[in-house]
Structures are given as structure tokens and as C-alpha cells.
């Protein structure tokens, strides 16, 4: 583990200055004057100073009792664990991996493969699972290479300890919140197919993988599929309980705990302690079904079959992938045609940690094919001494008493559980139907073009595009959230980048102003990107405003609410505005990912996961049936329009006298499309 500095607590006045700067672009002059008076009032400063001193004392005690900690850590856990609504679409994000180019998905492949129509699925799942086991081995042996920023600055590695064997457990009787349970001795995985559960051991007592090659694992996965298919559709899909609110799920678990037959409770404990869950989906998605694949990876699909000859209502009517999940844990999802992704419970880990996992297992799964051809292939999971990450087979002495043949988990149901399963299924079906997802794959240019031609930070640039698209559609600016990683500090998590600035507003308005010159638009774009990059740097250094103020609020709420009146800043409308993230965005770029996404965090908002590659930009947009497709289309139009502005400016520089009619007409058509939202919505465009 690297020896890192503690996450700093900024000076209070610096935090307040940043807060005022971040909220100002979202207010009119009257609102901002009121907020400034509130924030700078003696009443507010006295209260916050008291809480700030208590926070410094709390952090000092924490540093002494647990050096590997941070002041925000427990408060951040509580923010997740106190959340009572379903984790589906509200907490869990997903990553979709790129396809495996060494596994061909064709009808001929399926027909000739050893596992029939499931050949591609079984091989992909076996490769990725084997690679994950190597990853776990390195974590437990302490040989996982330290994460760094550009190969230099080391990052905190504490989150990897909670990545596997962890489960979000609903509150027990009398408990105020969920808790994160981690079994550091877990050696088994759970696999699901058609909502049915199986388990088997995958690590020996030395934490060495039992299945050293994918081929050794394939038959286990195929036998699970065959057994589940032979069982028909009568099994109880207990995974749907993890889609319930925490209170409902808690009541069901309590009922199972007190049942005379302890079979169901034993099953729960076995799933809770599993390393992770392998979800083998009985569905394939074609290339033109990317939006539906996104839905399946993030929340599962809802497919209702009302044919009475095939199913007996009310159970077993739902045949979508939403029943083939266990949302309280890390899940590896593999479709029938080999599309693969990861859905993860967010409490203990952030996207950067899971991205490292995704990168390593994707790379290793590809290399495993090459190693079958030649042994002269690098092993990314080799130890520092070059020793391979696992022996060819786990020794018998350390594999004794391990269960390597899949065993099915059988559930006992009664009238209460049958009705609970039914209503859980109808609720998740309702929830899924309320959301829509749109994928934008922009291939005209990417990070390389943005840096060399536009001279902008790619992330800062794309953030401006989101604001342009939203303003073009709705004529206003809303709160935008982007997480900045603070893992350069011990047990760091994230800080909130607030993307709307005075500079970004000027750029957005200029881009939509047909009277503004291209030179002006370019300069304002550079100003906006520079401001965004500066905020990003400060946040990455732990010098933001959101986490500090949130810690102060938590201190007041937990220990001082009976002694101290709530500080005025937390009663001001600006605080509500800043917490209402209409555009919740996150950048998780890596070549191993096909897409990345999550649900909106407000009822009227958008969730925007994006990947900036060298020559393309991929965006997944989610919302509760706002104009999602139109919003994504405006992003694309904005990207194209900005590129045309630079091309026109370059042409003028090369030929100052050239003024072609074609370029003028192109500009007019682009702006007509971007401005179409103003004619459709009766809103002010002066915000």
C-alpha cells in the first residue's frame, strides 16, 4: 500500500468562496445577492466555524486511531447506506466491455461449437471469470500493482479490499441503515441463469485459482445453463428481492431468518459472502439494439409473457433479464451472444476502481487466447518476480473439501414469499418502464483532435458540449455534477466538479448567437475549458467545496442538531439548487469499454456517462422519458458545429479573403437545428 497524505480539509473561507463562485452562474442577480448575504452573515460564519473546528478535531482523532482513513469516508458511506429506495437505477452503474475479437459470434460458430447456441457465451464468461480470479489472487497476495496517475503519482488502493466478497445488507431490526459486509475469506462464486442460482468454489485455501484456464471452467458454466433450462420456468426468482426498497427487503430477510426451515437463510448467507455473481443471460442483442443492451446491463429488461399456455400467472410472467440479477453485489453479466459488462454496488467502490478491474480482465481475457497459441505472451497478472499468477492446477492438499462442481440453491416458498416475489417483480417492471436510454457514438473525432486542433482539454471540452445541448433544448442552465477522483490521498473518494461557470455560459450563448464571430466563439471556448480544468485540478487536490460542506452538515446532523441551529447556508435556496444535479455526468474513458452509464439522480434530470477515445466519443444518456434522443442529437450537432467553426477559422487564416456561400449556408442550417428548442419551449433564454 502506498504511503499517502491525508485528504486535506480546506480553510473554511476558501470553501465558502468556492461555493459562492460555483453557485453564482446558476442564479440571477437578486438570488445571488441574497445568497451572499446569507453565506457571509455573522450567524452563518459563527455556526460554520464551530462545526469546522469540530471537523478538524474529528479528523485529528481519526488520523491517530486509524491512519488509513479520511474525514469524509464515513459520512460518504452513510450517504449510500442510509438511502432507502431501490439501488436499481439509483445507485448501481454499469460498464460494458468491448467485444472479444477472438470469439466469433456467428450462426456457424454456434452450430459448430461444443456448447451449441451457448458456445460464445460460455467461452466469454469463462475467460472473464478466470481473469477476475487472477485479479482477486493479486489483491489477496498483496501483489496488485499500485494505481498511478500517468505512471507517477500513486493512488490509494483501499477500495480493492471491498470489491470482492462484499454485499450491501439491508438494515436489521432496529438498525437505522444498511451496512456493507465484506468476507475476506470468500472462495466461491454464484452463477445465475433464468433467475436460478448455483455456486461452486473457485479459489483454494491459498487464494490460488482452482480453474487456472478458461477451458477448465467452461463445463461448469455450461452445465449450469443446461440444468436451469431443464428445470423450466417454475423456480422462484429470489434475485428480484434485491430490487426492492431497503425497508421491504429488510422485512423479507427478517422473515427468512425467523422461518422454521433455514434453507432460504443459508442460501442468502452463501450469496452474501460470494466473491461476485456471474449473470448468464438467456438473451442476445444485435448491433442495432445497443439502447436495449444498455438497459439490460444497467437495470435489466422487462419482458412480459401473458401466454397462459407457457406461464402460470402471477409468477413467471416476467421473462426479462431484470430477474437474473443480484443487485447488492458486483455482477459480471454475459449475454447469449457474448456481450459482457459489469454492474456494481457503488457504496464501497468508485468507478476508477472498477475501471481498473475491467481493464485488466479484458486485457487478460484477450491474452489468454494468445497464450493458447504461444507461451511467449506477457502475463499481466504475473508477480513482480515474473512468476505466473497461478499454477496450472491448485494442489490437492489446498483443494481438499472444496466444492468445484456447481450446486444449485433450492428455495422454499410459501404464500407470503410468493406474493412478495410477485409484487417485487411488478414494481421493478414499473420502474424499468419509466426510464429510457440513448447511446451516442460520435466517430468524427475524439481526444486527439480536441487536443491538437481545438487546443482544449478533452474532458473540459465535452462538458461544454453538454451545456450547449441542454441550453439549446431548454434555454437555461442547470446544476451539472462531475466527480473528480481524490484517490491521490489516503482513502480518497471523489469531489464534485461544478461545470457551469461564468465562462461556460458566455461560450454557450455565443455558440448559439449567429452574430458572434467564430474567433469570439473559439476564444470563449478556450476560456470555458481553462476554467473547467482549473476547477478539476483543485477538486483532485481535495480543494473543492461540496465534500467539506457536506461533512459539516453531517457533523451538525449527527451530533449538534440539538445544540446548534442549522447554519443558514444549509437553509438557503442555493444549497437545494446545488444538490439538485439535473445533469449528472461522469467520464470513465478506457479503450476496453464499449459504453458506461447510470440513471439520472433527479426526477427531471439526465444521467450522462461518457468515454472519450482518441478518435471518437461515446455517450450514454438516461432519463425518465425526457427528450433523451433529442438531447443526444443536440450533443452530436454541437460537436459538429464546433468543428466547423474551427475549420472556417483555419480557412480564413489560410485565405483571408475567402468567404464561400457553402460555409455560410452550412452554418445557417446547423444553427437552425440547435436553436429549434427555443421555438418549442416557452422558457426564458437569458439565464
From Swiss-Prot:
GO biological process, one term: carnitine metabolic process
Alphabetic keyword roster: Acyltransferase, Fatty acid metabolism, Lipid metabolism, Membrane, Mitochondrion, Mitochondrion inner membrane, Phosphoprotein, Transferase, Transport
Catalytic residues identified in the record: 346
Catalysed reaction equations from the record: (R)-carnitine + acetyl-CoA = O-acetyl-(R)-carnitine + CoA
Residues where (R)-carnitine binds: 481, 494
Binding-site positions, CoA: 446-459
The name this protein goes by in its record: Putative mitochondrial carnitine O-acetyltransferase
Organism: Saccharomyces cerevisiae (strain ATCC 204508 / S288c)
Gene for this chain: YAT1
Amino acid at each position: 500500500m502506498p504511503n499517502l497524505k491525508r485528504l486535506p480539509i480546506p480553510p473554511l473561507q476558501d470553501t465558502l468562496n468556492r461555493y459562492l463562485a460555483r453557485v453564482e452562474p446558476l442564479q440571477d442577480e437578486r438570488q445571488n445577492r441574497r445568497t451572499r448575504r446569507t453565506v457571509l452573515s455573522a450567524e452563518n460564519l459563527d455556526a460554520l466555524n464551530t462545526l469546522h473546528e469540530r471537523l478538524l478535531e474529528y479528523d485529528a482523532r481519526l488520523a491517530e486511531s486509524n491512519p488509513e482513513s479520511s474525514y469524509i469516508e464515513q459520512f460518504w458511506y452513510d450517504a449510500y447506506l442510509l438511502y432507502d429506495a431501490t439501488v436499481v437505477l439509483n445507485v448501481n452503474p454499469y460498464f460494458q466491455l468491448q467485444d472479444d475479437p477472438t470469439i466469433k459470434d456467428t450462426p456457424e460458430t454456434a452450430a459448430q461449437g461444443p456448447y451449441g447456441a451457448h458456445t460464445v457465451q460460455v467461452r466469454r464468461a469463462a475467460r472473464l471469470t478466470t481473469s477476475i480470479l487472477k485479479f482477486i489472487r493479486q489483491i489477496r497476495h498483496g501483489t496488485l500493482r499500485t494505481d498511478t496517475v500517468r505512471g507517477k503519482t500513486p493512488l490509494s488502493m483501499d477500495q480493492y479490499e471491498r470489491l470482492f466478497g462484499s454485499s450491501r445488507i439491508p438494515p436489521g431490526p432496529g438498525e437505522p441503515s444498511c451496512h456493507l459486509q465484506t468476507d475476506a475469506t470468500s472462495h466461491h462464486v454464484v452463477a445465475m441463469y433464468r433467475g436460478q442460482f448455483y455456486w461452486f468454489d473457485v479459489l483454494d485455501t491459498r487464494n490460488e485459482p482452482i480453474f487456472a484456464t478458461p477451458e477448465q471452467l467452461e463445463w461448469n458454466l455450461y452445465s449450469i445453463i443446461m440444468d436451469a433450462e431443464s428445470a423450466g420456468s417454475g423456480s422462484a426468482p429470489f434475485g428480484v428481492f434485491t430490487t426492492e426498497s431497503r425497508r421491504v427487503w429488510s422485512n423479507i430477510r427478517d422473515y427468512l431468518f425467523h422461518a422454521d426451515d433455514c434453507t432460504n437463510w443459508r442460501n442468502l448467507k452463501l450469496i452474501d459472502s460470494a466473491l461476485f455473481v456471474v449473470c448468464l443471460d438467456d438473451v442476445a442483442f444485435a448491433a442495432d439494439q445497443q439502447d436495449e443492451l444498455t438497459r439490460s446491463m444497467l437495470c435489466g429488461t422487462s419482458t412480459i409473457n401473458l401466454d397462459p399456455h407457457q406461464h402460470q400467472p402471477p409468477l413467471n410472467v416476467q421473462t426479462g433479464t431484470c430477474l437474473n440479477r443480484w443487485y447488492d453485489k458486483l455482477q459480471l453479466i454475459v449475454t447469449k451472444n457474448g456481450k459482457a459488462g459489469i454492474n456494481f454496488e457503488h457504496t464501497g467502490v468508485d468507478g476508477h476502481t472498477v475501471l481498473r478491474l475491467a481493464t485488466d480482465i479484458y486485457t487478460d481475457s484477450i491474452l489468454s487466447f494468445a497464450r493458447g497459441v504461444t507461451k511467449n505472451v506477457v502475463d499481466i497478472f504475473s508477480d513482480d518476480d515474473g512468476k505466473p499468477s497461478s499454477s496450472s492446477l491448485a494442489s490437492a492438499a489446498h483443494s481438499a473439501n472444496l466444492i468445484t462442481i456447481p450446486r444449485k440453491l433450492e428455495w422454499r416458498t410459501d404464500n407470503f414469499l410468493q406474493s412478495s416475489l410477485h409484487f417485487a417483480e411488478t414494481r421493478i417492471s414499473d420502474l424499468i418502464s419509466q426510464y429510457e436510454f440513448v447511446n451516442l457514438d460520435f466517430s468524427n473525432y475524439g481526444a486527439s483532435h480536441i487536443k491538437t486542433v481545438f487546443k482544449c482539454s478533452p474532458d473540459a471540452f465535452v462538458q461544454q458540449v453538454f451545456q450547449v445541448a441542454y441550453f439549446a433544448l431548454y434555454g437555461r442552465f442547470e446544476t451539472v455534477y462531475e466527480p473528480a477522483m481524490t484517490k491521490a490521498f489516503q482513502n480518497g473518494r471523489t469531489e464534485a466538479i461544478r461545470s457551469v461557470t461564468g465562462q461556460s455560459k458566455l461560450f454557450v450563448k455565443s455558440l448559439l448567437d449567429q452574430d458572434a464571430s467564430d474567433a469570439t466563439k473559439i476564444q470563449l471556448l478556450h476560456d470555458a475549458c481553462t476554467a473547467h480544468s482549473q476547477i478539476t485540478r483543485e477538486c483532485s487536490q481535495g480543494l473543492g467545496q461540496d465534500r467539506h460542506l457536506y461533512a459539516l452538515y453531517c457533523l451538525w446532523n449527527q451530533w449538534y442538531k440539538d445544540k446548534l441551529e442549522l447554519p443558514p447556508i444549509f437553509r438557503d435556496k442555493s444549497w437545494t439548487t446545488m444538490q439538485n444535479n439535473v445533469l449528472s455526468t461522469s467520464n470513465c474513458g478506457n479503450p476496453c469499454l464499449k459504453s458506461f452509464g447510470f440513471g439520472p439522480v433527479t426526477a427531471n434530470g439526465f444521467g450522462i456517462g461518457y468515454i472519450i477515445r482518441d478518435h471518437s466519443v461515446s455517450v450514454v444518456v438516461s432519463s425518465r422519458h425526457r427528450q433523451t434522443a433529442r438531447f443526444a442529437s443536440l450533443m452530436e450537432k454541437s460537436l459538429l458545429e464546433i468543428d466547423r467553426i474551427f475549420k472556417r477559422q483555419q480557412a480564413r487564416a489560410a485565405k483571408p479573403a475567402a468567404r464561400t456561400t457553402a460555409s455560410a449556408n452550412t452554418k445557417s442550417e446547423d444553427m437552425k437545428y440547435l436553436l429549434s428548442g427555443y421555438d418549442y419551449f416557452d422558457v426564458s433564454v437569458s439565464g
